[in-house]
Amino acid sequence: MSNAIPTELSVNGKNYSVIKLLGKGKGGYSYLASDGTNQYVLKQIHHEPCSYYQFGDKIQSELNDYNRLKKIGITMPKMLDIDIENERILKEYIEGDTIFDMVKADRVKSEYAEQVKAMCKLLYANNTNIDYFPTNFVVQNETLYYIDYECNDYMEEWNF
């Protein structure tokens, strides 16, 4: 995939208009997209090298991680559709500011740290870590969402 932002992407034959690039992560590009009625996050898996992380089957990993976190009870956007062939995921769009942006604007509340700690309690009891980078958390209506699906087996050096 080139660095140009696509104007349209499909998921299992359904077309979505791309509004903007939300971000690029280790495993893919996340776009704000619309079907004309609702807004979604449409993630396109990429295969660009990452010097500090080894991937297997990225699209299957996303699905497995989503199901693992859902079972644990982590507050996150719903996976609405997955297109295995084109390596695309359609997610619920959680509108709000990232913790990263809130830190920059000095708008972080102690309740958000408490919500992360509550997530950690669930995660650690299930031998799981998530990616705690501040751009992976969005606040909507005072609720903190983990918007990435990445998770791994618990390792002390990666805990919160």
Give names to the regions the model predicted.
Residues 18-60:
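ATP-binding glycine-rich loop module of kinase domains
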Residues 54-72:
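The N-lobe alphaC helix and its flanking beta3-alphaC-beta4 segment of protein kinase-like domains
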Residues 115-122:
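Conserved hydrophobic core/spine positions of the Hanks-type protein kinase catalytic domain
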Residues 55, 74-113:
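Conserved structural core of kinase catalytic domains
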Residues 132-137:
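Hydrophobic residue at the +6 position relative to the catalytic HRD Asp in the kinase catalytic loop
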Residues 1-19:
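Juxta-kinase regulatory segment immediately upstream of eukaryotic protein kinase catalytic domains
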Residues 125-129, 140-160:
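C-lobe/activation-segment region of protein kinase-like
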Residues 40, 75, 89, 145-148:
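Protein kinase-like catalytic core scaffold
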